[in-house]
């Protein structure tokens, strides 16, 4: 059950991100901004990753070289928070928004620790409750 909830959350997050990107490109004609993952030119992205001089761990979503997978940042840190799962992995979710709520989640050093203890606010506390089947 917990895997289903996490998978569903990831699917919704990715679908929303793809829809937003589509609408953004549709309204602005692509704008000339190269996506971080190089989706417009997969071969270029693949070459950049394969030819990386990283001697530690290369984050697949961002191409950053870090000490281990747990240090990989979210691809969109200004709008996402990284939530650690009980098994040591992590997922990136959209930051909670709303008056009096969103400011609490701006610091990446602490935003993953916040638990609003409210199932209507999707933060890392909610992710952990969902993982345990409590939501």
Swiss-Prot record:
Top-level taxon in the UniProt lineage: Eukaryota
Family annotation (InterPro entries): LCL2 (IPR034543)
GO terms of biological process kind: ERAD pathway
Keyword entries, A-Z: Signal
Signal peptide: 1-17
Similarity section: Belongs to the LCL2 family.
Function summary: Probable component of the endoplasmic reticulum-associated degradation (ERAD) pathway.
Protein name according to UniProt: Long chronological lifespan protein 2
Organism name: Candida tropicalis (strain ATCC MYA-3404 / T1)
Name of encoding gene: LCL2
